[in-house]
């Protein structure tokens, strides 16, 4: 059986979330007992909790919601690369373009170790020029371990709008700890939530034959 890596965050009460966004909670509704044969819980969370896919409607009022977004790009061969440098943005020069080699799905690692327990306001965003070059090489899906393609303080959302121009897809909040750079099969299907601007997902990388 091919080796598999789980690149999702664990949804839990102390999950770091974007400042001001909804904290995750899992509350008991029914519990197993003399009058109830099952356990049932109620979830409270943001559409951007943990590893998630942004829908086009997140950054474009006329964009599709996550339930209407085609699924093809969320499954298939991908390339995981580590960004060099330590500036606030991942610039084109920070990526190994020979390794990317025209991949349709590109995952970009910015953390040596993912900050699972603390919110990092200084995560490395992707520069819009990097998005443009990825699009020019044939990339259709970008996945990052950062909380967003754009900086926390951005009001212009330059990277997201570069994605919009090229009809690309976005995965954010992935965890690449313990996964070597290389070629993999990506499986990262977002939940089908009508009207939602994003959705959490269980993302995995599978070793290619």
Curated annotation (Swiss-Prot):
Pathway involvement of the protein, from the record: Amino-acid degradation; L-tryptophan degradation via kynurenine pathway; L-kynurenine from L-tryptophan: step 2/2
Enzyme class: hydrolase
GO terms for MF: arylformamidase activity; formamidase activity; zinc ion binding
Binding site for Zn(2+) 2: 54, 160, 172
Binding site residues for Zn(2+) 1: 48, 52, 54, 172
Gene3D superfamilies: Putative cyclase
Keyword Ligase: no
Enzyme Commission (EC) number: 3.5.1.9
Cofactor binding note: Binds 2 zinc ions per subunit.
Chain residues that bind substrate: 18
Active site per the UniProt annotation: 58 (proton donor/acceptor)
Disulphide bonds in the chain: none
UniProt keyword annotations, A-Z: Hydrolase, Metal-binding, Tryptophan catabolism, Zinc
Catalysed reactions listed for this entry: N-formyl-L-kynurenine + H2O = L-kynurenine + formate + H(+)
Role this protein plays: Catalyzes the hydrolysis of N-formyl-L-kynurenine to L-kynurenine, the second step in the kynurenine pathway of tryptophan degradation.
Family statement drawn from the similarity comment of this UniProt entry: Belongs to the Cyclase 1 superfamily. KynB family.
Official protein name in the record: Kynurenine formamidase
Species name: Maricaulis maris (strain MCS10)
Encoding gene, per UniProt annotation: kynB
